[in-house]
């Protein structure tokens, strides 16, 4: 997978990998905000995709909203909520 275009019901995609504490923090924020606004989200584990690792490995977690890069390293709940409004 090389693009961030989500299925119709998923507006937020978070690229991360296991063992990444910033990813765990991002998943928690994204889950909370998406639940509050009724938006779907999913996590994409990049460790098995060399292209994604090369592109995003130093920036994870990387958050996309509606197919466009929104944040990396940390997710600001207010900024994410505004992007989903």
Where are these regions (language model features)?
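Local sequence-structure signature of Cys/Sec-based thiol-disulfide redox active-site neighborhoods
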Residues: 3-32
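Conserved strand-to-helix beginnings and helix N-cap segments that scaffold or border functional pockets
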Residues: 24-27, 53, 77
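Thiol-based oxidoreductase modules, predominantly thioredoxin-like and allied folds used
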Residues: 39-50
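Short Fe-S-cluster ligation motifs
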Residues: 48-62
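A short, hydrophobic beta-strand/beta-hairpin element that forms part of a small beta-sheet core
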Residues: 61-69
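Thiol-/selenol-based redox modules, centered on thioredoxin-like
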Residues: 80-85
